[in-house]
Amino acid sequence: MKVIISCLNSKFVHASLSPWCLAAGVREFSKKEYEVSVVEGTINGDIEMFAHKIINEKPQVVAFSCYIWNITKTLETARLIKQNCDCKIVLGGPEVAYRAKDVLERFEFINFVLSGEGEWAFPDFLDNINNDLSRVCGLTYRQNKEIITIPEKEYTDTPPSPYSDEFFKQLNGRIAYIETARGCPYRCAFCLSGRCSPLRFFDLERVKEDIIKLATSGTKTVKFVDRTFNANEKRANEILLFIKENYGKEIPEKVCFHFEIAGDILRESTLEILSSMPYGAVQLEIGMQSFNEDVLRKINRKTNTKKLIENIEKLMSFGNMHIHIDLIAGLTGEDLKSFKKSFNIGYSLKAHMLQMGFLKLLYGVDMRENSEEYPCTFNTEPPYEVTSTPWLSSNEIKMLKSCEDALDRLYNSGRFLLTLEYLTEKVGISPFDIFNDFGNSVDGNKMRLCDYAEKLYNFFSDKCDKEILREKILCDLLCCSSSVQIPDVLKIQDTLYKKAKKYFTENGNKFVKIAILYSENKIFAVDQSKEKNLHNRYEGEIYSIDELMLL
């Protein structure tokens, strides 16, 4: 039997692990022989071409991994395949597992939905597809005019490794994902992870072998998909120490390992290891969601916010890793005033990225299934974002969308950090007000960087010293790109600039870009031949004009 396992990734750079997990399960547990191949695509590609790529293989079974980012395109692909190929189509993944009956009722071209851990369930399904389907745990299927669902089975073993030779051929330098644990110790009302199987950890020696395989595959980033990497302190420490001890040896330098952690439960032992990790070897993503503990309690999230802040400040002080923190707008009980406070606290931690997301009511989460306890309105199409709550109006959420856009363009891009520092620390404008007010005054979509910088100057120039603002924006532009165009409003041409440029060129610094800081009687110089920092920008240096004897 010819079987194709497929997944539409959000971008080419992302290589989904799920189809390879299914293929590994078939190799390990099937009682029969199957011709299995993995076919990947992207949601931005030509869906008709992708469907015909699968059709041309003439499979008997096509399986799709379904998520909120690909379900629409996956269903479109499945419909095309069914119209042109005599095959059975089975869907799996979190986007269909919690509404299996609904999927079969709505989409006649889908034959089966499979829930639970696919490494075991999928080979069992293939072995029984022409026999007794009632033996297949987690399967939902049609029988005459009735839809039957078989309960899932709970597993405790380590699943087989998905990292086959074929996996590495297709990885081709993309982001590599690794799963070392399954489940989550928390039961947050907006998340599926805690609803899955109880938290269990995979064999540690196998994990170490897989880390080396992925690190030497040519990828630049190895991303751990464990929902709370530091749920087990001893185990997390052992993995971090393994990476540290092998970095620059079996693990090539420049490979970065990404972990999702709970910041408030970080212990001193883990912090000590993290402080000694090689520069750039680690990225940490910390989901705060909110700093309002009443809000966190309402969504069943336990967080010691005081300890969380303390630990993030420690992590930032190490200066050797990229720190990414998350906030969610639309949570139960959080109004605009509360969100603004959470935002300003989050911003004050000066992480390299402050991601501002919007609550999504996924199938299967408590917040979707218990509308009385968690009242809100949301979009019924993926990704199911909240459109209003009793605490946040639809207009306020739209306003926050523009705030998010400005946050990404000004701060998360790393492009305007000096300007933001000036506006917040010297002028005294609150961080939230900067992004919210400016974001809602300008449509940054498809706007060139130089035009965006000009809009920024024009918006804030009457709220502060316009000369200092001009200098800060100019310095920021020099730090972020070697080819950026400087808007005319920021330019001042005089002989001093020419003298300074000549000075650096004659001293062998031909890659240096400079700005004259008239407000300080100094020169800001950026050597763009050097590597960018953790904020993805070049470092600038300050020189005294008198010291360089340019006058």
Outline where the language-model segments fall.
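A structural motif corresponding to the C-terminal lobe/cap of the Radical SAM core domain
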Residues: 8, 233, 246-251, 260-265, ...
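Hydrophobic/aromatic residues located in beta-strands of well-ordered beta-sheets
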Residues: 3, 36, 89, 136-137, ...
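A short, glycine/small-residue-rich beta-strand->loop->alpha-helix junction that serves as a flexible
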Residues: 9-18, 66-71
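N-terminal [4Fe-4S]-dependent radical SAM core
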Residues: 1-2, 136, 140-180
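Radical SAM enzyme core and accessory elements
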Residues: 1-8, 28-35, 47, 51, ...
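Glycine-rich beta-alpha loop elements in corrinoid/cobalamin-binding modules
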Residues: 2, 25, 34-151
